[in-house]
């Protein structure tokens, strides 16, 4: 059985490789719900983007800089610089931070997250009761779409204990 970390990957595997849907399942990456939990919202409107600063995220970051400026919000960007374009894009409402494992420090200080596809920052934000912007991008970073996503009612499906139980169930089904 093929374990996929999000529905889009499941669909991609089934359609690109002609895999029978009964041979695939979605088990989301697990998240430590003791680290990512409901925190009070900050007073200042702030969007958090966490990700590698590279060609794939350039147009997304440019869009976030423009959108947050228009909406009078701060934009915090956390990530490893693998391209030098960010230095030319920073504006007074944008702050850059080096990568860190302690991302919850930044999530606590934002009221929304943003990222490409359904990634860690969006899910960690949801677990912390923050809605998130999800950018759909192609393999070159072109923006195909952008959606604002409220915290899902079934956010507990991302808890580590549920991921473990789903993995065990998949093994039991195979055996």
Outline where the language-model segments fall.
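A short, active-site helix/loop in glycosyltransferases that binds the activated sugar's phosphate group
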Residues: 1-23
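Acidic donor-binding loop of glycosyltransferase active sites
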Residues: 108-120, 130-131
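Carbohydrate-associated surface elements
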Residues: 8, 27-30
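Conserved active-site histidine-acidic residue motif and adjacent donor-binding/catalytic loop
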Residues: 80-83, 94-107, 118-120
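Nucleotide-sugar donor-binding and catalytic loop/hinge architecture
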Residues: 34-48, 70, 173
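Conserved catalytic-core segment of nucleotide-activated headgroup transferases in glycan assembly
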Residues: 46-88
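A charged, aromatic-enriched C-terminal amphipathic alpha-helix characteristic of glycosyltransferases
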Residues: 146-175
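Catalytic binding pocket for nucleotide-activated donors in carbohydrate/polymer assembly enzymes
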Residues: 120-157
